[in-house]
A protein has these predicted regions:
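C-terminal helical cap(s) of enzyme catalytic domains, especially alpha/beta-barrels
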Residues: 242-246, 261-301
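Conserved anion-binding
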Residues: 100, 104-204
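Conserved, mostly hydrophobic/aromatic
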Residues: 20, 64, 99, 126, ...
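Short, well-ordered coil/turn segments that N-cap beta-strands
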Residues: 14-18, 59-62, 92-94, 122-124, ...
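Conserved N-terminal beta1-alpha1 strand-loop-helix module at the mouth
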Residues: 1-66, 71-84, 90-91, 279-299
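Acidic (Asp/Glu)-rich catalytic clusters
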Residues: 12-13, 52-59, 86-91, 141-147, ...
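A C-terminal functional module that forms or caps the active site or interfaces directly
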Residues: 205, 209-254, 258-268
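N-terminal active-site wall of soluble small-molecule enzyme domains
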Residues: 57-62, 66-119, 162, 211-215
Length: 301
């Protein structure tokens, strides 16, 4: 059995390293289109449906990352759209990363693991916050072993506030993120041993591409760990930094707003928005073009 991180690594080699983030806020859809649907959640689902199909057909990405918060913000209907979006990604043949960033005591973590690795919200890979301790990872890694699931653990994030904790120096030397990384390396190696015939571990790391200064050092320190790389595009990270982070075991580079809101920089779309003739297919086409351009940009490195 191949685990999902291995499948993702292989899809990235085949389709390119782009991950399309489905952080689909209703405000990312033109008002004139929103008005044609019964609810904002219904409009979001249709945008996701058309975009997932187009991206899969174009082979411009290896996976989708679905940020649960945007769906929770739409209430019960939004949660239903979240579940339906996960199914649409699964049907596309690409990997689904659920960006849930869960982290809690082991008993609660077990409930989170069941919630997102089985049932209505079942997904391929999830993001995990390790800051309540590494024992909180065990319920998730158990699913990596028995069901081929994968996890990305926060290591060096892409937000400016990461300096508040991740970059803090420890009295015994090194930074907080280095201590997290060393433990993550140990866990990743243990998990890799359960899949000796595969080229990566089901345990990966989230490493943002907004800081060039330590990109090479991080890649060198964690050569055998597959990276989820946020921060490309709207957050200011560039393809050169991504190229450094994608070396060794590799990685997938996420872009969300840069793709979902690409219509705002498309002259044809903005003209149609102004005269009230823009259709969902127009903003999907703009997003698809942005995905192809992002893939080509990333492949330069």
């Amino acid at each position: 059995m191949k685990h999902n991180m291995q499948i993702l690594q292989e899809l990235a080699a085949k389709n390119g390293p782009l991950c399309v983030g489905l952080d689909t806020d209703p405000s990312y859809i033109p008002e004139s289109i929103l008005k044609t649907f019964k609810s904002p959640a219904e409009a979001v689902l249709e945008y996701n449906r058309q975009l997932i199909k187009k991206i899969a057909d174009d082979k411009s990405a290896c996976c989708f990352k679905v940020q649960i918060a945007y769906y929770e913000a739409m209430g019960l209907e939004g949660i239903k759209v979240y579940a339906e979006t996960l199914k649409l990604v699964k049907e596309s043949g690409l990997i689904c990363i659920s960006d849930i960033k869960r982290g809690d005591i082991a008993a609660t973590a077990g409930a989170y693991a069941r919630a997102h690795f089985t049932g209505d919200f079942e997904t391929d890979i999830i993001t995990i916050n390790p800051y309540m301790g590494f024992d909180t990872l065990k319920p998730f890694t158990e699913y990596c072993t028995k069901a081929g699931k994968g996890i990305f653990v926060l290591l060096r994030t892409s937000n400016p506030g990461m300096v508040d904790i991740e970059q803090k120096e420890l009295k015994d030397g090194g930074r907080v993120l280095d201590q997290v990384g060393n433990e993550l390396k140990r866990i990743s190696q243990e998990m890799k041993a359960t899949y000796p015939d595969q080229t990566c571990s089901p345990v990966g790391a989230v490493v943002g591409c907004t800081e060039e200064s330590d990109a090479k050092a991080l890649r060198d320190a964690y050569k055998d760990i597959y990276f989820l790389i946020p921060g490309y595009g709207a957050q200011g990270g560039d393809a050169k930094i991504c190229g450094t982070l994608m070396k060794e075991a590799g990685g997938t580079v996420n872009s969300s707003r840069g793709i979902l809101c690409a219509w705002k920089k498309d002259a044809g779309c903005t003209a149609k928005v102004e005269n009230g003739t823009v259709a969902m297919s127009d903003i999907v086409e703009a997003a698809a073009k942005a995905a192809i351009a992002s893939k080509e940009d990333l492949l330069r490195f």
